[in-house]
Amino acid sequence: MMAVPSRCSLGVAPLVAMVGGGQLARMTHQAAIALGQTLRVLATAADEPAAQVTPDVVIGSHTDLEDLRRVALGADALTFDHEHVPTELLDKLVAEGINVAPSPQALVHAQDKLVMRRRLAALGAAMPRFMALDSVDDLAEIDAFAQRLTGSKDAPMVVKAVRGGYDGRGVQMVRDSAHAREVASGYLVDGMPVLVEERVELRRELSALVARSPFGQGAAWPVVETVQRDGICVLVVAPALALADDLASAAQQLALRLAAELGVVGVFAVELFETADGALLVNELAMRPHNSGHWTMDGARTSQFEQHLRAVLDYPLGETDAVAPVTVMVNVLGAPQPPTLSVVTMDERLHHLFARMPDARVHLYDKVERPGRKVGHINFRGTDKDRKNPTKLRERAELAAHWLSHGQWTDGWDPHRAGDDVVEISLACGGRNDAQRQR
């Protein structure tokens, strides 16, 4: 199959094809509009977040070669909302002349944790100690691994499926060797190889987000702190506070070096552990816009979504400086129970949020709310005072996210109660009275 000439080569505005119709594709579409570009998405259904807003949609599967060909037809670049596309299919597209960015040779390092670990080891990147298991016959090796870690079979460890895990799926914390064998065997009997890793003593988790173009230009955003609960990122503080300049620079340089060594094109996230003794260890890699970069939509000169488009089209990359002393991003997750009837719709909750916190920058994905599902995020920009002590800014962000998820203010605030309309002051708006914005 011969590649169809790209739109750029015909003097037409660029077309980027993206595999996946989720929120990352939706927000990339928003960035494409501003740049005068077109984003075509491969979605599994018409009600996926990107498919609802993008006029150019292909309904199909990321595991079907013909569907991949359809979405890539005439595109200047084919890129990804997720990393689950089989690389053997991408190899065929590359052979047909399609510009796949990042390439399958790079993408496999974000798909396969064992491939990633072995390559990073060869590149000298620091990471948790690990061992690989391919068969239930190898389970006895876990005891010896635990002994090497701590001198005891009681060492706590982490068991990971080699492929397919995200947002905490496919990752389990285990108490000791016996627990590790039990968890690992569950994956192995299903034919999924596993990694067993040491559980390091953490100070916190960080993310170094960079972008790289085919020309080799790189750009790095400030290193951020990510807060995880139940394996899901719930909050990001940008930049990471109380992070020494030399450590922040080391994280950025590591991410840029890995992007170059792996041949990444596009946005590239390196998830890091900052250990209790001040070391940086690589945890995971992502080769696409990343949850830890959502703050850039309101807190940086160039958002990760615009930058991703620039990178895959080999445009000069944008500036990555922060535009506020600190930005807090908080994810809106579906609540365990539906909100009360008085605020049953997201639009009603959004109205009340803006009445109380007009400085909230809300990004909703138009997804059906389910427990724990990411349905949006909110960015709050802070001041120099907030950067010195971000507690109040973080509390406001979590308060706002809980309200959008649950329809309840955890501090007891009630917009319908007499008197409340005139007493609530937005903490981040110079003391202006929010009653001016109440209906």
Swiss-Prot record:
For this protein's source organism, the top of the classification is: Bacteria, Bacillati, Actinomycetota, Actinomycetes, Mycobacteriales
A Pfam family of this chain:
PurK_C
Domain (ATP-grasp) spans: 117-313
Q: Which residues bind ATP?
A: K113, K160, E197, E198, R199, V200, E205, N283, E284
Q: Quaternary structure per UniProt? A: Homodimer.
Its annotated pathway reads: Purine metabolism; IMP biosynthesis via de novo pathway; 5-amino-1-(5-phospho-D-ribosyl)imidazole-4-carboxylate from 5-amino-1-(5-phospho-D-ribosyl)imidazole (N5-CAIR route): step 1/2
Provide the function of this protein: Catalyzes the ATP-dependent conversion of 5-aminoimidazole ribonucleotide (AIR) and HCO(3)(-) to N5-carboxyaminoimidazole ribonucleotide (N5-CAIR).
InterPro entries to which the protein is assigned, alphabetical: ATP-grasp, ATP-grasp_carboxylate-amine, ATP_grasp_subdomain_1, PreATP-grasp_dom_sf, PurK, PurK_C, PurT/PurK_preATP-grasp, Rudment_hybrid_motif
Q: What is this protein called?
A: N5-carboxyaminoimidazole ribonucleotide synthase
Any one GO biological process: 'de novo' IMP biosynthetic process
Gene that this sequence comes from: purK
Alphabetized PROSITE patterns for the sequence: ATP_GRASP
Under the GO molecular function aspect, what terms does this record hold? Answer: 5-(carboxyamino)imidazole ribonucleotide synthase activity; ATP binding; metal ion binding; phosphoribosylaminoimidazole carboxylase activity
Query: What keywords would UniProt list here?
Result: ATP-binding, Ligase, Nucleotide-binding, Purine biosynthesis
Source organism per entry reads Mycobacterium leprae (strain TN)
Catalysed reaction per UniProt? 5-amino-1-(5-phospho-beta-D-ribosyl)imidazole + hydrogencarbonate + ATP = 5-carboxyamino-1-(5-phospho-D-ribosyl)imidazole + ADP + phosphate + 2 H(+)
Q: What is one term from the GO cellular component aspect held by the record?
A: cytosol
What the record says about family reads: Belongs to the PurK/PurT family.
Q: What is its EC number?
A: 6.3.4.18
